[in-house]
């Protein structure tokens, strides 16, 4: 494909200059869900590529994705907890995966869809829930994370009478991390598991420590990989490239109302 460096307003005002050249812009939807907030559609033309992260591959979203098929990578979030007290207004994993199959049938490239099991609760029950998604998924490229138990998340869990997975701690115990590593080691070695900011899970043969925006994404979008750099850090151990730019402006929980959401509002 023909690649153009561009200077525009809005999203692209964040272009940075390295060595006299403008960096590319890869838009991403981490601050909300693009199946609810469609404001991202007005920004696609100002991006070189877009990574959509959604818990609901709805028919309306599929229609929009197909309009920008050459620019989009889809992360279809599917934890297996949809429709439960933890994700009360999220579609079930069966429905979400059926919608992924519908998108594939519409002609969207399989190599630009990742099933995002984000988060996983590393308990026996939590790993069983994640395994159901893995077994049923038509896509065997996954991005995974463990649940971050922020204080406000623990408070929500208590209000909903959900057992705290790590007691009063933020992250899993070493025993829980070990259980998850053993679970990953038992997976089909042909499956791909990507992690970002999860150093406890890196190092296994089928696990790649790779940013949510990475040179792998750049190549899948047929963009040049020479003039990209790491540095899109959002937190400790983040591996994202500096060309990552948020497309949504929500700073509160969306209407899916997930109990583990990092937004306090």
Language-model region placement:
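A C-terminal junction/extension of Radical SAM enzymes
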Residues: 171-240
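Conserved C-terminal portion of the radical SAM core fold
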Residues: 98-156, 183-198
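Surface-exposed cleft-lining segments at the edges of enzyme active sites
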Residues: 82-90, 114-124, 162-171
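Flexible glycine/acidic-rich beta-alpha junction loops that bind and position SAM and/or redox cofactors
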Residues: 84-86, 141-168, 196-210
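Core AdoMet radical
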Residues: 22-99, 112-116, 141-147
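Short, Lys/Arg-enriched N-terminal segments with co-localized hydrophobic residues
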Residues: 1-23
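Well-ordered, non-membrane alpha-helical segments in soluble/globular domains
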Residues: 37, 89-101, 125-133, 169-184
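Local cysteine-cluster metal-coordination motifs and their immediate loop/turn environment
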Residues: 245, 249-264
